[in-house]
Structures are given as structure tokens and as C-alpha cells.
């Protein structure tokens, strides 16, 4: 059974593509028809592609991998943040800083600065420093949280990227491709699907459409995590049972 229904996709307006004059011919296979100068996406293909992306991210999660959610356009910012947090993943929803993946060592120094400023405040330094300096530190902190808060706990490269609008996030995609990090993307009719490993043909401009699909990808990750935890529990239970059996055997021998 599909993880998403045609009804859900229709209600969220996932089928509305861009104007026919603003299209990428490579998306032709995902287009159903044209209506009033707008391309209509083939939702049967979207259903199948959502399944593929879902299963991939579920597997990444089962294997203990992490996913970086990227969506800096206004329609995606809130969904990307809330769904990444819900799934315990990382996100960038303001601006992609150049080298975020390819020069992570430098970026990680800036992330470290977040903790440094927090410690300064905890240690009471804000109370003894000049007021002007404290104001500047708070501004710096707010700026760092705004742009890097979503990856402050990211200690290594993500195992996958989930991207809303590849055209908008072309820098993120270029860096991920350079590092061979698989990409799942919501791809509208004006985008190049060849840059994306797991294409989800869909409207990337409607908030409801973006939220629905982003939530589904978060669900996949959560399901994968559940699989991991279930296996761990089962393994622990087997160990406990083995120990119990050994203990019972020892007691029987002693008797």
C-alpha cells in the first residue's frame, strides 16, 4: 500500500506545476497535461516516487544515518524546521552558507562559537563585560542560531539530503553531489530532475504541498528509527533470555 494517497496530494495542490513557459523539458515524463497555461503533474507518478523516497530515507534511518533537511524559500522554512526537529534531524532554513558541507571544518568552528557564547553567559561574564560588548555578543549569537542553529549538533556529514526546490538550493545540491551524498528532492516542473537521486515531482511553491511531503519524509525517518529501536530491544531481550537460561541450567546442575 502506498504511503500517500492521490486524495491527499490533490487536496494539498501537489499537482499544480509552473507556467508552461517556465519549464524544464527534462520534467516532461512527470507531466500529465497542461491546463490554462499551467502544467499539471502526473500524481500517479508522484505517489510511486514518494514511496521510493520514503523507503530510501527509512533505510538510511534504520542504518543509523542522519538526514539534512534544506529549504530556504519562505514556503518551506517552517515545515523544514518543524519536521526535521520532529524526526530528530538537522536543517537549514534561512540561507545556505557556502562550504557548509565541502568546508565543514571551517563551518564547525562557527558552530562551536554558539556554545562558547552560551558558556560566557552561564559563567556570568555578561554581567562584568561592558554593555556594548554584551549587545554585540548577543547579536552574534542570534545570527549564528538563525543560520546554523539547525546543524549545531551535526558532528559529521549527513548520509542524505532532503531538499525543497533544487533550483533555489542549487549550492547545497552542488556540494552534496561533490561529496556523493544522496539527495531526495521536491522537484517542480521548472527544475532539473537529473541532479536529484530520488525525485518527488510536485508543487514546491504551495505551503500545504511542501508541508505534506516534508512530513512524509520525516515519518519515514521516524519509522526507520523505530525499526532500529525494536531490533535493539529484541537483541537485549535475547541476551536476557540467554542469561536466564544459563542461570537456570546452573541452578539445576547444582541441585
From Swiss-Prot:
GO cellular component, one term: cytosolic small ribosomal subunit
GO MF term (any one): structural constituent of ribosome
Region of interest: Disordered: 226-255
Alphabetized CDD domains for the sequence: RPS2
Biological-process GO terms, alphabetical: translation
Family assignment from sequence similarity: Belongs to the universal ribosomal protein uS2 family.
Stored PANTHER family: 30S RIBOSOMAL PROTEIN S2 PROKARYOTIC AND ORGANELLAR, SMALL RIBOSOMAL SUBUNIT PROTEIN US2M
Name of the molecule in the record: Small ribosomal subunit protein uS2
Lineage: Bacteria, Bacillati, Bacillota, Bacilli, Bacillales
Amino acid at each position: 500500500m502506498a504511503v500517500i494517497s492521490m486524495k491527499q496530494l490533490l487536496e494539498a495542490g501537489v499537482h499544480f506545476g509552473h507556467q508552461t513557459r517556465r519549464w524544464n523539458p527534462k520534467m516532461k515524463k512527470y507531466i500529465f497535461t497542461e491546463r490554462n497555461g499551467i502544467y499539471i503533474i502526473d500524481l500517479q507518478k508522484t505517489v510511486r516516487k514518494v514511496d521510493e523516497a520514503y523507503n530510501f530515507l527509512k533505510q538510511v534511518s534504520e542504518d543509523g544515518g542522519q538526514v539534512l533537511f534544506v529549504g530556504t524559500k519562505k514556503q518551506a522554512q517552517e515545515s523544514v524546521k518543524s519536521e526535521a526537529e520532529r524526526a530528530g534531524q538537522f536543517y537549514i532554513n534561512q540561507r545556505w552558507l557556502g562550504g557548509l558541507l565541502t568546508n565543514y571544518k571551517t563551518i564547525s568552528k562557527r558552530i562551536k562559537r554558539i556554545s562558547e557564547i552560551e558558556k560566557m553567559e552561564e559563567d556570568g561574564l555578561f554581567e562584568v563585560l561592558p554593555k556594548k560588548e554584551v549587545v554585540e555578543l548577543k547579536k552574534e549569537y542570534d545570527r549564528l542560531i538563525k543560520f546554523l542553529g539547525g546543524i549545531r549538533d551535526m558532528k559529521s556529514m549527513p548520509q542524505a539530503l532532503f531538499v525543497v526546490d533544487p533550483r533555489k538550493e542549487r549550492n547545497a545540491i552542488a556540494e552534496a553531489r561533490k561529496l556523493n551524498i544522496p539527495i531526495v528532492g521536491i522537484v517542480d516542473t521548472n527544475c532539473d530532475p537529473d541532479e536529484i537521486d530520488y525525485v518527488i515531482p510536485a508543487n514546491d511553491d504551495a505551503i500545504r504541498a511542501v508541508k505534506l511531503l516534508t512530513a512524509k519524509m520525516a515519518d519515514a525517518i521516524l519509522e526507520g528509527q523505530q525499526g532500529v529501536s525494536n531490533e535493539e530491544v529484541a537483541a537485549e531481550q535475547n541476551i536476557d533470555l540467554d542469561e536466564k537460561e544459563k542461570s537456570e541450567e546452573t541452578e539445576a546442575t547444582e541441585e
